[in-house]
Amino acid sequence: MRTVRGPSDRVVVVGAGLAGLSAALHLAGRGRDVTVVERESWPGGRAGRLDVGGYRLDTGPTVLTMPDIIDDTFAAVGETCSGRLDLLTVDPAYRAQFADGSSLDVHSDADQMATAIKEFADAKQAAGYRKLRDWLTRLYQTEFDGFIAKNFDSPLSLVNPQLARLAAIGGFRKWDAMVNRHISDPRLQRVFTFQSLYAGVAPRQALAVYAVIAY
């Protein structure tokens, strides 16, 4: 994102999707006069809903992976997320169904997930899951601090100490290869790699940096 030079007291944000609304709140919190324009008659962008034949259908994102960012957005204008929204944890997050007829409930809690994997496969796979989770945590922390939470005015901005750390922990290796180091059960490997499809990339082709989606 290039830094804007010169006066920026009045800002127009195009689109009232989640990104547009977030940008507007952060700008307003910094004293800017903000106008948001949206082509639809409702805000939310892709995070919408259709009512069809008595059913409610999501039109876009169905998973909230980084609630802390919502907290930061509300805090920018002196509000709190909890004062406006009730975020309820879904447990299990989802159920994975496999071609052999087996199924696995996927939990966000590490202990619950390890127990589920032990019952689904064996203790070795459960231990591998914990090691995988530790690696994903380090990967996320490295990416968030060095890249996700930063603005970049030029490609040279990408060159920083975090880039070397990212390479050292395997961020530029293949996603499926890194997962396979910890887990050998093909079904479990799919559980922790299919998320690359969200980015339109097959797990065998995706770089491990994308694995933060699974985290």
Give names to the regions the model predicted.
Residues 205-215:
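Residues forming anionic-ligand binding surfaces in small-molecule and nucleic-acid pockets
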Residues 99-207:
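Rossmann-like flavin
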Residues 5-142:
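N-terminal glycine-rich phosphate/pyrophosphate-binding loop and immediately adjacent elements
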